[in-house]
Regions:
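Cell wall/extracellular polymer interaction/catalysis modules
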Residues: 1-37
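Basic/polar, cationic surfaces and motifs that engage anionic cell-wall
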Residues: 1-12, 16, 46-50, 55, ...
Length: 137
């Protein structure tokens, strides 16, 4: 098993309220980016449904230089209708993220929780301060 030191939260950078599946995100990454699979390990749908992406045992493709020891979690949304960054998480997404993060912190107690924007300066993703919001998990 690979070491897990970080859990990194992302958004799909899609408009508020627009549904996208893990299969769609996988296609964006495989066909659009030329990757071999979806970059994230989990996708959180608008209704809070959790879909799996890459297996945890496999390094993701979500933050350059930090994939080997992290888990990538993405929620669907993160932009307003004009494609400006906005925290668009539904109540169901917030609850699902919190539940998943608690599970992951139990499984990987030394892992810290971060937003993508903490590693990639200039990015708004995940459109909220994940490190601050989840600091006490």
């Amino acid at each position: 098993m690979r070491p897990i030191n970080r859990i990194i939260i992302h958004c799909t950078a899609t408009p508020e309220g627009r549904h996208h599946t893990a299969a769609e995100v996988r296609q964006w990454h495989v066909k659009g980016n030329g990757w071999r699979d979806i970059g994230y390990h989990y996708v959180i749908q608008l209704d809070g449904t959790r879909e799996t992406g890459r297996p945890i045992e496999t390094a993701g493709a979500h933050v350059r230089g930090h994939n080997a020891d992290s888990i990538g979690v993405v929620y669907v949304g993160g932009c307003d209708a004009a494609m400006k960054p906005k925290d668009t998480r539904t109540d169901a997404q917030k609850a699902a993220l919190l539940c998943l993060l608690r599970e992951l912190r139990t499984a990987y107690p030394n892992a810290t929780i971060h937003g993508h924007n903490e590693f990639d300066i200039g990015k708004a993703c995940p459109s909220f301060d994940a490190g601050k919001e989840y600091a006490t998990i």
